[in-house]
Amino acid sequence: MNLALDEAKLAFSKKEVPVGAVLVKDDVVISHSYNQSISKKDPSAHAEMNVLREAAKKIDNYRLNGASLYVTLEPCLMCFGACIHARIDRLIFAAEDQKSGVVINNLNLQDESFFNHKISVSRGSLATESSVLLKKFFQERRN
């Protein structure tokens, strides 16, 4: 989660929404990234999506069985859906997203039985640090 937070800080320095993600498989970091929607002018360039795309290219397969995704913010609907399609095993997030998060907030999708793949979800460390960084970013944007 520390590497994911480092990615979020990098996003912050580039005036992107400070969310970072890291994908690990067999105790090896396969990919890491941060939100790049603003710079890429791409609404799908969330940290999670960037990490999943990069990992799929590296292992030459979009199925990421056995992988764990660490992310500094609870995923949105798009990102959680991509995690299911990628067949990751574990999702560990730091801060809850009460506005757009769908894993435990709003839609609470982690408990839905209609998905063809079940992801083990847990809250990781650094929730406070991740939340503080996000709040600082949006406060600066408003001023």
Task: Give the residues covered by each predicted segment.
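Small-residue (primarily alanine) positions within well-ordered alpha-helices
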Residues: 4, 8-11, 21, 31-33, ...
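Helix-adjacent hinge/juxtasegments
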Residues: 41, 45, 49-82
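Short beta-strand scaffold segments in enzyme catalytic cores
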Residues: 19-27
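Short, basic and Ser/Thr-rich N-terminal targeting/leader segments
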Residues: 15-19, 65
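Short beta->alpha transition motifs characteristic of CBS
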Residues: 30-37, 118
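Zinc-dependent deaminase
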Residues: 1-12, 62, 75-143
